[in-house]
Regions:
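Active-site neighborhood for divalent-cation/phosphate handling
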Residues: 78, 82-188
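A short acidic Gly-Thr/Ser loop motif
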Residues: 16-23, 84-86, 197-200, 205-213, ...
Length: 241
């Protein structure tokens, strides 16, 4: 995934994590087969700029993004973002295994009303073919991801105004899992025996934000389980007081 993002025409890429309290960023560079972390930045967002992951105070978020841009001190403009929350829907569907990707896309659009509880014109819909189904012969498992257009469009507009160009919009929990898979594979390529063994066990990652907690588990390059909870450090610190 990361190698595809950092193709020859995209030597630098900024990963943006837009939270409810902070904006975090990393600047990545691809050099041959290696990905290098060039810079990191973190800026607070004044006030309560979000309500249930929807942007309410565009000016506060814009100021934080401008500070991020200055902190990275580079000319890179292309960014990767991810979204989460109740406006994001992930669902597993089962489709005929003899369909091409184009046929699969057409079939998903035809069945969208029964698969996604929102009108097709109100969402962005994407899918990924996971592989043969163990439960249903001659079927393939397909992961569907849908998000309200407003959630994506508001972020794209704001990022564009600040001077960023959005290259990738992903789902947070799957971006987390893909990063875990990628770096596990990168560790294995070093020929470290411990890294090879680590790739053959279940690996987990927890991302704890101010208002959300995300968990993912991967094994041998595959996502086993993901879960998102609508509580984070705000609730945890209150409970500990």
């Amino acid at each position: 995934m990361f190698n595809k993002l950092l193709a020859k025409n995209t030597q630098h890429l900024i990963g943006l994590d837009i939270g409810t309290r902070y904006v975090k960023a990393i600047l990545l560079e691809q050099n041959k087969q290696h990905i290098t972390l060039l810079a990191i930045a973190c800026e607070s967002i004044n006030g309560n700029a979000f309500a249930e992951r929807e942007i309410k105070d565009f000016e506060a978020l814009s100021q934080a993004l401008k500070k991020i841009k200055l902190s990275l001190k580079g000319k890179a403009k292309q960014v990767a973002i991810a979204v989460s929350g109740q406006a994001v829907i992930n669902k597993l569907a089962y489709m005929d295994d003899d369909l091409t990707d184009i046929e699969l896309e057409s079939q998903i659009e035809l069945e969208a009303d029964s698969l996604i509880p929102y009108p097709l014109e109100e969402i962005y819909l994407d899918f990924e073919r996971l592989g043969p189904s163990a439960s249903y012969p001659s079927k393939v498992e397909v992961l569907l991801s849908a998000v309200h257009k407003d959630m994506i469009d508001s972020r794209l507009t704001l990022l564009n105004e600040v001077g960023f160009e959005t290259k990738i919009a992903d789902v947070e929990v799957y971006a987390l899992a893909n990063a875990l898979i990628h770096f596990a594979a990168a560790s294995e390529s070093t020929n470290d025996n411990s890294a090879v063994l680590a790739d053959k066990i279940v690996q987990c990652c927890i991302n704890i934000g101010a208002s959300q907690l995300q968990f993912c588990a991967v094994y041998d390059g595959q996502v086993l389980y993901t879960k998102e909870h609508n509580f984070g450090l705000d609730v945890l610190t209150q409970d500990s007081c």
